[in-house]
């Protein structure tokens, strides 16, 4: 904000802006055509249509230069970048093709993820929040069908051994709270050695604000041989817009897109935290990670209503969102009302399925 203010003051006064006053952090920002980047890092930024770090382009030349009044901003559709800047912003990029997959033992799919983390200095609750924006880019040459995007959180609230989690589907919210009034599995002490909050226990929430955009589906079921598949007048580009997900064929309206919210909320537990079955443990292989993302337990069993959500047998009600009740209401389904005990839960707020095309 000091940089923005200083540039504006120089501009209003009709005097040259002192480029030496620009903080190094702004000159190191990885935005398109940053002329100072190579001075610090001795290599050039890639030239890419995605543009890397988003910024406000003061003179509209498509190039980032803080000495010309440019500054980092939040890339958000429908929001002008000029007024959409936080007090602090961090940008980073990672991909799944640069090294071996030691957690999943899976194969790379050439997915790039660009992340903006940012925060605001305010006098209200926003001061206690941090925000994260993720951009997923398919760098492969083929589309990825049945894509799921998930926010994974290991929400250790002080001592991890006495945590419960829940979800509020009306807000796409995950929250973690303590099992009782003291943080710790032995009074205010924790067997893992973690520092506890003792009798000043907070609550943490992760809000899934917005999901990815996907083409609107005009028809949700088709059979092979359906005459509409041959109707080139009603669907002139039909063979370019077919999508098959979970054995169902869709026609996609590529001119209109809808926002996909949180389609499932799942959790799993650390092995050794309680005596829970192996189907509820942390994933170890690529298919197990995918199952949690797509709303199933580690072994493919669907989540069901009540208890821990792992209820094998006929008559169980299949669900997409686990523990959705208010912990303060014993008649609602929550980990508190189910009295689940020790488990150290980790959560997944997911969106899908959708098709992610290259680029």
Question: What residues fall within each predicted segment?
Answer:
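Extracellular/surface-associated beta-sandwich interaction domains
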Residues: 1-358
